[in-house]
């Protein structure tokens, strides 16, 4: 399929609309149980992009452990796939890179585990740097945090499943991120499309619920960087990241859809952050005195009520 994909990329397009590309890589499987899970996530991602978000199937490339010579998730396959996009990509185009599998950190470098030699965060950054269009890199693996620093830059949105090199356990972030891409409930501003920020927010909240429902401490905290400083921001945290991601969509334009209301979007994001804070407070309840918990709970509920009231006012205008 890669050969056909490369030929297609060499033919000039008659369309002036921005093109959307995707590269989905599931790395070295390891145990058989991982192979089944990674295949499920990969297939779900492809189905979501093609059937729900209307990507051209010829522009969705997959690499995986056990694939044929053109689809094996090794370093050579990754380089071929990125080179194929680079040959065609314009400044108006978008590429989604979704990494699913195992990640590692050896004390010096963070790597995404491939079949054969791995590629480090720095090597991924070098591969993607020549691309002229917008790149959304989502590394859903453990120890993915260093990718934030290396890949971030102008016209780059980087999401990592972890916020520390110490987070080396298997992640559930891909389950919730892939689901959020076309989930109407993730569309918090109700404009008919799920932005990258909204998918990140929905996935982050899903991960928190996963651990809370099991009575476990979360071993992963996702970050998003879209301002190029390599610092990143949690879904419920403070920071300047999120503006570009809030205006970046994988879905095609929706005819007649309202423009993004910056003030409403800020309020919606604030409400989501407060809801995350409320969930965190419940997790910490056993570590607090009853008075401390009651006081903090009351403060959050008052803030939530104020923000919700402002949202209703904006939605009526």
Q: Predicted regions span which residues?
A:
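Caspase-like cysteine protease fold
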Residues: 187-275
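Active-site-proximal C-terminal subdomain of hydrolase catalytic domains
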Residues: 136-226
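Bacterial N-terminal signal peptides
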Residues: 1-13
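Alpha-helical, heptad-rich or low-complexity scaffold/stalk segments
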Residues: 140, 260, 267-268, 273-315
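Second-shell loop/turn segments in exported
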Residues: 28-36, 64-72, 85, 109-115, ...
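Boundary/activation segment at the start of structured domains
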Residues: 14-96, 103, 110-112, 243-257, ...
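Active-site-proximal beta-strand/loop segments in catalytic clefts of secreted hydrolases
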Residues: 25-29, 63-67, 98-102, 115-116, ...
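Caspase-like (clan CD) cysteine peptidase catalytic core
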Residues: 81-100, 105-149
